[in-house]
UniProtKB/Swiss-Prot annotation:
Reaction(s) this enzyme catalyzes, per UniProt: alpha-D-glucosamine 1-phosphate = D-glucosamine 6-phosphate
Entry note: cofactor: Binds 1 Mg(2+) ion per subunit.
EC number: 5.4.2.10
Keyword tags: Isomerase, Magnesium, Metal-binding, Phosphoprotein
Name listed for the protein in its UniProt record: Phosphoglucosamine mutase
Family according to the record: Belongs to the phosphohexose mutase family.
Lineage: Bacteria, Pseudomonadati, Pseudomonadota, Betaproteobacteria, Nitrosomonadales
Cofactor: Mg(2+)
InterPro entries: A-D-PHexomutase_a/b/a-I, A-D-PHexomutase_a/b/a-I/II/III, A-D-PHexomutase_a/b/a-II, A-D-PHexomutase_a/b/a-III, A-D-PHexomutase_C, A-D-PHexomutase_C_sf, Alpha-D-phosphohexomutase_SF, GlmM_bact
PANTHER family per UniProt: PHOSPHOGLUCOMUTASE (ALPHA-D-GLUCOSE-1,6-BISPHOSPHATE-DEPENDENT), PHOSPHOHEXOSE MUTASE
Modified residue annotations for Phosphoserine: S108
Post-translational modification summary for this protein: Activated by phosphorylation.
Record GO biological process: carbohydrate metabolic process; peptidoglycan biosynthetic process; UDP-N-acetylglucosamine biosynthetic process
Positions of Mg(2+) binding: S108, D247, D249, D251
């Protein structure tokens, strides 16, 4: 059954436009609460379920948080409020506190005027499709506030950030530290603003923290993992050894070398996997996505490490890991899942696993990646309006087929609709940069023209 509200990463949209409104979040909190009450058989009859609500630093988070907590309370569910906190911190605390669910109000890497919400189960993992469908069914039912004696209580969780900082540090080996390492940490003016730099500092690094002054409007603005050029400039300015950039909700990470070279999620997962293989600690294979560079897949093959591709989206990477009983997966955008360390993608913990590899071996990022000659890969995001279906458009199909014939076996083409924004993503990969750029531009322009024609009816 197709879902009405939930996409690949929860619910997301423009603040003030349905469904990112206080009214909807009130009803959503109530609906989730009713599903929790009906499904949790382990609670005693006189106990209420508890939900932890976290958020990033968007100005709209306060408004939506208030509506959501009211909905939970009306359903008879207790609420803990953490304040601004990274998405993976909420996933961790749900497990650590042994409560029934977590909610994160965030639009991740999107601009400040977007927002959204994602939920975590008591196991700290994304909700299954079946539960999201139950929630959507409950949303169609009228609200009926529980009797006053059964209303949920709301309180603030003290030291949520401190608990999470200690958890992050626990994933780094006790026998190593980061002394002598100068690190620039770009916090994207997001949920990691009061956490990421502290983790690195407490492990001994000389830390320069940038974009750690959120004002409600500057999240992801020309900073963080979506604007890596800012970190590249900071690295050179501060003569740092390495740079770390997270996104607005802290679930993805990119890294930059002292020379200013970018290392994406593909590269970082390869470094972690190669190091674990050297230690004899790699369990199973590695999960990537349809976007993973072909050179990385070939490099894993040379190392004898099994590799498989999931659809784009960290929930699909996580599902593939669980199916194969593997423990490491990544997207090139920087979502990296180390299942032996955490249940979800975590920017800080992923960066620590890379730093572990560097400190343990004495190698640099470049040293680890020397045997991976990346294929040129061009990604173009094409904005579209309405419900343009590129899959059934003959002109788009013809252009794609022409490109595939030109690239042959040395290239890949991927067209997909974004699950969170009105975009069609065009990815072309090949051995020759000029040819890769040419076909990416041509396919993107064909989509633009066909989408415009479909809107005008011509």
């Amino acid at each position: 059954m197709k879902k009405k509200y939930f996409g690949t990463d929860g619910i997301r949209g423009k603040v003030g436009d349905f469904p990112i409104t206080p009214d909807f979040f009130l009803r959503l909190g109530y609906a989730v609460g009713k599903v929790l009450l009906a499904s949790d058989r382990q609670l005693a009859a006189d106990k209420r379920p508890t939900v932890l609500i976290g958020k990033d630093t968007r100005i709209s988070g306060y408004m939506l948080e208030s509506a959501l907590e009211a909905g939970f309370s009306a359903a008879g569910v207790d609420v803990l409020l953490s304040g601004p906190l990274p998405t993976p911190a909420v996933a961790y605390l749900v497990r650590a506190l042994r409560i029934q669910a977590g909610a994160v109000i965030s639009a991740s890497h999107n601009p400040f005027d977007d927002n959204g919400i994602k939920f975590f189960s008591s196991a700290g993992s994304k909700l299954p499709d079946s539960m999201e469908l139950q929630i959507e069914a409950e949303l169609d039912q009228p609200m009926k506030t529980t009797p006053s004696i059964k209303l949920g209580r709301v309180q603030r969780l003290r030291d949520a950030a401190g608990r999470y900082i200690e958890f992050c540090k626990s994933t780094f080996p006790n026998q190593l530290d980061l002394r002598g390492l100068r690190i620039v940490v770009d916090c994207a003016n997001g949920a990691d603003y009061h956490i990421a730099g502290h983790v690195m500092h407490e492990l001994g690094a000389d830390v320069i923290t940038t974009h750690a002054s959120p004002d409600g409007f500057n999240i992801n603005y020309e900073c963080g993992a979506t604007h890596i050029e800012t970190l590249q400039g900071s690295i050179l300015q501060h003569k740092a050894d390495i740079g770390i950039a997270v996104d607005g909700d802290g679930d993805r990470v990119l890294m930059v070398s002292r020379e200013g070279v970018l290392y994406d999620g593909d590269s970082l997962a390869y470094i972690i996997a190669k190091h674990r293989q050297q230690l004899g600690e790699l369990q199973g294979g590695v999960a990537g996505t349809l976007m993973t560079n072909l050179a990385v897949e070939q490099a894993f093959e040379r190392l004898g490490i099994p590799f498989a591709r999931a659809n784009v989206g960290d929930r699909y990477v996580s599902e593939l890991l669980q199916q194969n009983d593997w423990y490491l997966g990544a997207e090139n955008s920087g979502h990296i899942i180390c299942r032996d360390k955490h249940t979800t993608g975590d920017g800080i913990i992923s960066a620590l696993q890379v730093l572990y590899a560097l400190r343990d071996t004495g190698l640099t990022l470049a040293d680890f990646m020397r045997d991976v000659p990346f294929f040129p890969q061009r990604l173009i995001n094409v904005k579209v309006s309405g419900n343009f279906d590129f899959r059934s458009n003959p002109a788009v199909a013809a252009c794609k087929n022409e490109a595939e014939q030109a690239l042959g076996n040395d290239g890949r083409i991927l067209l997909r609709a974004s699950g969170t924004e009105p975009l069609i993503r065009v990815m072309v990969e090949g051995k020759v940069l000029q040819q890769t750029d040419y076909w990416a531009e041509k396919i993107a322009e064909t989509i633009r023209q066909q989408a415009a024609s479909s809107m005008t009816g011509s």
